[in-house]
């Protein structure tokens, strides 16, 4: 039975190590970063401008604060403009603006390859930090899951379900931390003076 608990962590470890391998092999992470940006914008739009609520009830201020915290360069339309769109239109517009903001960030670098290297370093650091936290969290979950047994629930099923949710939260946190860091990087230009 302990092997089945270990199997859950092994599956998650394989996913994380594969991602680390891609980074360490020097693959361009550009598409990965763009996916992280668009997924983050989608998640925030779903959270603050739900299709289940009328546009007048959308929390545009909350959406703006959360997007701006991670992507400071992303400008939202006015609340009135946001509420005049469908959620799909708003999402599309914000994803376009998020991607454009990153293209502008890329243009701040003298060479695109410099940003590619920064992306790899940032992604690796964030993955490693979040993965270490996740290992600790999964260990605590495993220790605490035995208490679930009295509730006529299968502890292994509970561990798998909760562990899967926690893994999803970790991958979302990796994406959010990565793009936040990349959008907040300041590029310093060396100025050569003529003598």
Each language-model region and where it sits:
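Extended, charged helical/alpha-beta scaffold domains that provide interaction surfaces
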Residues: 1-195
